C-alpha cells in the first residue's frame, strides 16, 4: 500500500525493478487512479493487493457544477508522483527514459461515474458526459505539463474505450476528440509522442488510432499482428502482442523468448 502514497518508496520500487530487469523505460503515475482521486473519487488500497474503486463519485451530474479541472501543482495526491519523478529524473538521466502514465479520459470517466452508468449516459445524457470528459482532459493536460518539467514522456491506456464496450461511432464522439487533444498537447509540451496501449479487439477503431501522435501503439495479444503490420504498420509503430498471462506470467523463459522473437519477426516487416 505504501507504494501508492510514498514518493521515496515509489522511486525505490522502480529503481529495484529497473536494476533487476533493465527494461526500456520507467513508467510512473499518476495513472487513472491518481487522477480519479484528484478529482474526488476514492479507491480502497488493501495492504497487499490491487486497489479498487470504493463506489462511483459522480452519483448525480450536479456534482459537475462544482467540479473543476485539477491544477496538479496544487494537488497533494498528484504531487506524490511529482516527487517520485523528481527523484528518478535525476537518477535516470541519460540512462533510461521516464514516462508519466495518465490513463485515458473515457476510463477515468468510468471510474468516476461507474462503467454501466457512463455507457448508458452516452446515449441518454451525452452533454453531461462531454462536460465530464472536458474536466478530465483539462486535468490530464495539467499532468502533461508536470511531466514536461521533469523531461518525461507520456503513456496512456484507455481500456474501457475498446469496441467490446463501445462501438466505433461512440468512440468517434466520446473518445477520439479528447485523446487527439491530449496526444497533440503532449508533443507540444514535451516534444515527445505518446505511448498508447489499447485492450481488446480494436480493428474497428484503427482508423482513429493512427491519427494520434504516437511513438507506439501497444496492441492486445488477441490482435493478429500480421494484419496490424499490413494495415497500419506503415502509419504507426506497433508494440505489444505477447500474451501477458499464458506466456509472460505462466510461461517458461524459452516460451517467452520464442513469443517475443515471433512478434519481432512479424513486426519488423512494418
Where are these regions (language model features)?
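A contiguous, low-structure linker/loop signature
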Residues: 34-71, 94-95
